[in-house]
């Protein structure tokens, strides 16, 4: 089974090629625009923007990571969601959760593992995660890869979660137990609003499980964000109202980085 069958099979082996690739993705997002992709890619290749040893390696990162995550993923042209933060010179601690969120959406293998395995760990089921746990989960999902490929994908998945700050540790990984900065959560909520989520859906959205947050924890985060004037949060019984002090991503990026 190859990567072109993703419309039928949700999981790919792409993570074996580099995991998070966070710095590479940031460089490409900063270089991207609404010009034809072929023209931008050619400039990136000529300048060796990613400082790779060969053009083939740079092109591989573009094809296997940047395209599915930030050009042709579940959110088309997702680079436009995070670019305003880069233009506002947001610090790494603020942009990293947003890149993680978009990557987990584009790589269902990563997102589902976080929801189904790590979200349970956050509630006290198990404290550590190793390659064997990932491989067992792959087997439960019927992943069709060879043992060698499965091991490489498992290592790439764990490395990605470490680089995104979800896990910590070298060999035996454990949950970092750190909540993303409020500005990051507020910015993701604003992106979800632009994708059509209403106020109640923002609190209950399944994407918060990627950060091991229950609806109650999301509500508390929104209350703190309200106090920090990142958004306005009102709740009366089952009625929830969330409003943002901006109409565009560019405006809101300035709000969360002030």
Predicted features along the sequence, with ranges:
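Accessory, usually C-terminal, subdomains that scaffold auxiliary metal cofactors
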Residues: 168-251
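Eukaryotic partner-binding/assembly regions in large regulatory complexes
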Residues: 1-105, 109, 113-120, 129
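Short amphipathic alpha-helical interaction segments
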Residues: 53-60, 145-163, 211-224
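Beta-rich nucleic-acid/ligand-interaction surfaces
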Residues: 136, 154-157, 179-180
